[in-house]
UniProtKB/Swiss-Prot annotation:
Pfam families tied to this protein: GCV_T, GCV_T_C
Organism (species): Leptospira interrogans serogroup Icterohaemorrhagiae serovar Lai (strain 56601)
Protein name: Aminomethyltransferase
Keywords: Aminotransferase, Transferase
Subunit structure: The glycine cleavage system is composed of four proteins: P, T, L and H.
Role played: The glycine cleavage system catalyzes the degradation of glycine.
Molecular function terms from GO: aminomethyltransferase activity; transaminase activity
Reactions that this protein is recorded to catalyse: N(6)-[(R)-S(8)-aminomethyldihydrolipoyl]-L-lysyl-[protein] + (6S)-5,6,7,8-tetrahydrofolate = N(6)-[(R)-dihydrolipoyl]-L-lysyl-[protein] + (6R)-5,10-methylene-5,6,7,8-tetrahydrofolate + NH4(+)
Domain of life: Bacteria
Alphabetical GO biological process terms: glycine decarboxylation via glycine cleavage system
GO cellular component: cytosol; glycine cleavage complex
Gene: gcvT
Family statement drawn from the similarity comment of this UniProt entry: Belongs to the GcvT family.
Amino acid sequence: MSQDKKTPLYETHRTLGAKMIPFGGWDMPVQYSGIIAEHNATREAAGLFDVSHMGEIFITGNPKSILLFLESITCNSVASLSDFQVQYNAILNQNGGLVDDVTIYKFSSEKYMICSNASNYEAVTEHLLEHLPISGVKVDNQSLQWHQIALQGPKANEIFSKFLKRDLDSIQYYRFMLLPYQGEEIIVSRTGYTGEDGFEIYSSIPIGLKLWNELLEFGKPYGLLPCGLGARDTLRIEAKYPLYGHELNDQWTPIESGIGWIVKEKENPYFSSEKILFQKKNGVPSKIVSFALTEAGVPRENFRVLDSQGNEIGKTTSGTFSPSLKKGIGLALIQSEKIKDGEPIQIEIREQPKQAIITMKPFIPGSIRKN
């Protein structure tokens, strides 16, 4: 008997015919109508994802104390956030590895929310509590009290605007608003994990269940489909987004993990800041890069990466067949000296080397709003 936790939408997923799999300690839908159909719906119209397994951790207290605390354990500049802005960040351990990659929501100088990965929110909470200042800051893990769904795709804005009967254009990319729905205030954030425009919507559990069912029905004429983890994975790999446990872990720094763009110099030092800033300036022996196959084959995790002479230069961290590009693509940790856009490499699939190239440019243009 599975001991995996179930999201509040578990029975709804079963009713919709979802295939369920264990993921990060949760029993989650991997697909409904099919991964490719769900992927294409999100790229061309819209997809609805259950992400209520994610963590919500609230940080409240004295403004100065909160800011000093958050700045000391992250590599991006929390100080640069304005109210109702969201930031992609990494919570670091003392060796410069990642406890988790997170999004930080600033409600006010006295209140922040950290959205963390499902498998990590307990570790994040423990890490925060371990390094909490003596006074002035409170950490409250509310992960099991919140419901979260993600509406993603080029028609997401039209669908949700008409559903709520209000203009949502004022919510810019990586911003959020508190909006009334069914007598409750919900968090509507213009963020996502697909490379498309869309929203991540936080609410109470009863409202979340109602919102999922009503939104799914309302969006049908627009081509909205419920989507599982399978499509979520193909979409995020096409968008070159990392996944904890694959491109990110507690050993690799943000520079090695390919998210060096979030590493900032700050007024005060943070965990391993000297090491990480040195790496950003001087480079690292290996780092995450993306690749595309130039012949038939589907790459997966932990396949050997070879140079054109057949020498091993790295390992794949994620791989899939891209429904949009109709070829195998992926991410890999590769020796930095070998990284060059268009550089021929080989991915060893079932002991057979398959031709590929390193791809520094985006796989897909996407429809993310940068306003």
